[in-house]
Design a protein with these regions (language model features):
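His/Asp/Glu-rich, glycine-adjacent segments
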Residues: 57-245
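PAPS-dependent sulfotransferase catalytic core
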Residues: 41, 112, 116-123, 662-737, ...
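Single-residue signature of alpha-solenoid repeat helices
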Residues: 435, 469, 503, 537, ...
Length: 861
């Protein structure tokens, strides 16, 4: 399994080159494989993105939060290291499984980890000294700790390319007018030589290992496209206003030349692998290259570099088991590692944020092997002090400063950058409360930083705290640079308050000021949509798509217009195109469901509703639509009632969360306590969840696992619970709700919260009988233990869990026996209500108990 990373690669530059026959190796790859867009993550900073690619996890979980990190020894900043990563990368997972792997030039890999295989870190290719012929290593000593095994360091040092080794003829492949002297004196050409030398060194290190060492996985990361694009994309045709005719003529061919170089390197790599190797090529984001480029310079120091990054990069797959000549849709950076695991016939961990790109596979089995996690106590970092070369670290920090990625080398500045980046991760993944915490800490250090003020305002808006949001906007009222974003946010505040006309006026003023963008045009379109001005809305969505054809929000809005104007087939197509670009948008799936209903595609509409409910488990809207469809289009009264009840509970919970301050004399709200239902599998936990929900406590569930013969009323599970050990963010809004957690996951609960645990007990033999029946129905064998051994294992688990619970000061426990609940539902409902301390509907709770479901009751002797 080979993964080739091309930082910043974009189909919009690649496709014209392929059409002209200038990237023949990639064309052959695509003809025999599949291709698609891949959605990036926020913030678009390479170390964070490539670590997400290598782990399948968001940055708040993998821990790499930028280009630099504080050095605990010196108190200064240093380039980000492998010790920052808090979870397993794919090469660590394979090492734990005894399978060899290799990684070349990946971000945050120095010092080299001691894996089963080989590592060439992101510091190996950096030229830290002058080239001096005749001296050891030509006066350019290799970086300690940059290669594993260490005995390969001298061998690989011989394949490095120093910038002084890049000849004028090689420069002229990209800049034909360059003279010999200019290649050594012109700052722009000297920068190009440095970047080409780095790229060549990475490629040489990769090819040195490719056919010489065994590997089941190899990751090669080329950063040249992105780095050279920041230096030269502003010269790409068509000529930008700030570029002179002379500079345009001189540098206009650089970027296409860089892509041709990568095609040649791809051809060499493909010759060194066999037909049994699957290959993924991907980028971490795209790069604007045409008339959609932002104003100003593309350089990192002089311009706004992230503005040049496009939301969608490229991904392509080739090899055994991969379809030929097909397209894939909805991929994200988080999907690469799960896909690699699947292609290597290894389970995909349920605590990963991504999913395998099975749409690229020729065949997909009925079931996909999974495991809870690959996280364990093993570490592959070098023992003792991490090897760090002061010269290399200094050179990298100087380069990062010169490029504008970081400020000075003071650790405080880096820590503030990490707060910003972590806050951006939280905000972009729908966790505004956590984002607010990070950016408030930024403002504690830099009270006048308007960018942080605006982000705090955005977080407050998402949380519904409109007055606090406006207070933050007032702080940037005199900043002309912040004015457009502040005006847009004020418009959204007015929209939240129901003043759609006032919001529209602000947006129209923004457009008339000469600041239109796809996002702004789309926002105006949605505002007109809410006001039922469909012609105006359609016009704005079309304008947004003319500017950016791959805008998922504009496509979604256009689909709504189509549906509401009687064009259901066109609406379905628009929503599907939106989802193909960015899959995790629950509202788009809901809009698709409505369009499918208008097109009389009821089964597909139900599927789309379920996806929306799964993606947004606290939103009542998908359940309301499901209830309506089951009642009026399917004729299933039981399922309609189930979803109607679920929607009512979720809407009541939402209302409680948004209520104002409590009046004197009113009962205490639920606050932060979470009610947890736990017990062994098949002990009856779903029944307890039904009782609590019937009583008025909202149940946290994503409806991912549907009802079946074993649980006719549903399983009441939340998939995110399984990842609690590495991501407990689902608890942020779980206060006042009930959730089902198996006993094995209780210890993963963070200790800074209050929990009410309802521990369901049931006769072990009944549990074993129920499990056996379920396994038989599913055609599975279960554990390789006899009944007596299983009984002992379960009894020991119960004993250990109960012992652990007695020592947790933040957990209250109520033990409930399943048999008693079935026999005396009213009595157990009263006990539950007293334990929870709520004014629950005990009659409804008792009514949720169906004695007919007690099918494995133990016969009395």
């Amino acid at each position: 399994m080979l993964v080739v990373g091309w930082d910043g690669a974009d189909w919009r530059t690649i496709d014209p080159l392929i059409e002209r026959g200038e990237m023949p190796n990639l064309k052959r790859f695509l003809d025999e494989g599949v291709r698609g867009n891949i959605a990036t993550l926020q913030p678009m900073l390479s170390p964070m993105l490539w670590t997400s690619i290598a782990t399948g996890k968001h940055a708040d979980r993998h821990g790499v939060l930028g280009f630099a990190e504080p050095d605990p020894k010196t108190g200064k900043a240093r380039p980000v290291t492998s010790s920052s990563r808090r979870c397993k990368a794919i090469w660590n997972i394979l090492t734990d499984a005894g399978r060899p792997s290799g990684v070349i030039n990946w971000y945050a890999t120095h010092p080299a980890e001691r894996i089963e295989g080989f590592v060439v870190t992101d510091r190996f290719a950096i030229a830290t000294g002058a080239l001096t012929q005749g001296e050891p290593h030509d006066g350019w000593p290799p970086v300690p700790g940059s290669v594993h095994p260490t005995e390969d360091l001298d061998l690989l040092a011989a394949v490095r390319i120093h910038p002084m080794m890049i000849s004028p003829d090689q420069v002229r492949e990209l800049v034909p007018s360059a003279t010999d002297e200019e290649c050594f004196t012109d700052p722009k050409l000297r920068e190009l030589r440095v970047l080409l030398a780095h790229c060549a060194t990475v490629h040489n290190a990769a090819t040195a290992y490719l056919d010489e060492r065994p590997w089941d996985f190899l990751g090669i990361y080329y950063d040249a496209i992105d780095r050279i694009a920041h230096a030269f994309m502003e010269f790409n045709p068509p000529r930008m206003a700030h570029i002179s005719e002379a500079d345009f003529a001189r540098y206009k061919g650089v970027m296409e030349g860089v892509y041709r170089l990568h095609d040649m390197m791809l051809g060499r790599v493909m010759k060194l692998i066999d037909d049994e190797t699957a290959v993924i090529i991907c980028s971490d984001h795209g790069f604007y290259s045409d008339n959609r480029r932002p104003e100003g310079s593309s350089t990192i120091k002089a311009g706004k570099p992230v503005a040049w990054h496009r939301t969608f990069g490229m991904v392509a797959l080739w090899g055994p088991g991969i379809k030929r000549g097909d397209q894939i849709h909805g991929a994200t950076l988080l999907d690469i590692t799960p896909t690699v695991l699947r292609l290597l016939d290894m389970p995909v961990a349920r605590d990963m944020d991504g999913r395998p790109l099975v749409q690229a596979f020729e065949t997909v089995g009925e079931t996909m092997p999974t495991c809870e996690t690959y996280e364990n106590d093993t570490s592959h970092l070098p023992s003792g002090e991490a090897l760090d070369d002061e010269t290399t670290s200094h050179e990298m920090m100087r380069q990062l400063r010169d490029l504008g990625y970081i400020g000075d080398d003071d650790a405080t500045g880096v820590e503030i950058d990490q707060l910003r980046n972590l806050g951006t991760v939280y905000l972009s993944t729908g966790r505004p409360r956590l984002a607010l915490e990070q950016f408030r800490r930024v403002l504690d250090a830099k009270p006048e930083e308007n960018g942080a003020i605006m982000t705090v305002a955005t977080a407050l808006l998402q949380m519904g705290r409109l007055e606090a949001c406006e207070e933050m906007l007032d702080r940037v009222a005199d900043d002309p640079e912040a004015a457009p974003r502040a005006s847009l946010t004020r418009a959204l505040v007015r929209e939240r308050r129901g003043d759609l006309e006032g919001a529209t006026i602000i947006l129209e003023e923004l457009v008339q000021s000469g600041l239109p963008s796809p996002g702004l045009l789309g926002q105006m379109g949605r505002m007109y949509l809410r006001r039922d001005l469909l012609d105006k809305a359609e016009s704005l969505f079309v304008r947004a798509l003319e500017y950016e054809p791959e805008d998922p929000e504009a496509l979604d809005g256009l689909g709504v217009v189509y549906r509401r104007t009687g064009r259901a087939p066109e609406a379905v197509l628009a929503h599907v195109r939106s989802i193909a670009l960015m899959r995790h948008r629950p509202q788009t799936h809901l809009n698709l469901a409505r369009a499918l209903l208008d097109a009389d595609r009821v089964p597909w509409a139900l599927d789309a509703c379920r996806v929306a409910a799964r993606m947004s488990p606290r939103d009542p809207t998908p359940h309301e639509l499901l209830a309506e469809v089951y009642a009026t289009r399917v004729g299933n009264a039981e399922k309609a009632a189930f979803h109607r009840k679920r929607a009512e509970a979720l809407r009541a919970a939402r209302q409680r969360r948004h209520e104002g301050p409590r009046k004197a004399g009113t009962p205490e709200p639920r606050g932060e306590a979470v009610t947890i239902v736990t017990g062994l599998p098949r002990s009856g936990t779903s029944l307890l969840m039904q009782m609590l929900e019937a009583g008025g406590i909202p149940a946290l569930t994503d409806s991912l696992r549907e009802a079946d013969d074993d649980n006719p009323r549903g399983y009441y599970e939340l998939e995110a619970v399984k990842r609690t050990a590495t991501d407990d963010s689902w608890l942020d809004e779980a206060g006042g709700c009930c959730v089902k957690i198996v006993t094995a996951l209780l210890r993963a609960l963070p200790g800074d919260r209050q929990y009410r645990v309802v521990f369901l007990r049931r006769d072990i033999d009944e549990i074993l009988a129920s499990q056996a029946k379920m396994l038989n129905r599913l055609g599975r064998s279960g554990a390789a233990l006899d009944t007596a051994e299983l009984r002992r294992a379960f009894e020991e688990d119960l004993r250990a869990t109960q012992e652990w619970l007695t020592h947790q000061p933040n957990i209250r426990v109520l033990e409930v026996w399943y048999g008693n609940t079935v026999k005396d539902a009213a009595g157990e409902a009263a006990r539950l209500a007293e334990f929870v301390g709520e004014d629950l509907d005990q009659h409804a709770m008792a009514g949720a108990v169906d004695d007919g479901l007690y099918r494995q009751r133990r016969a009395k002797s």
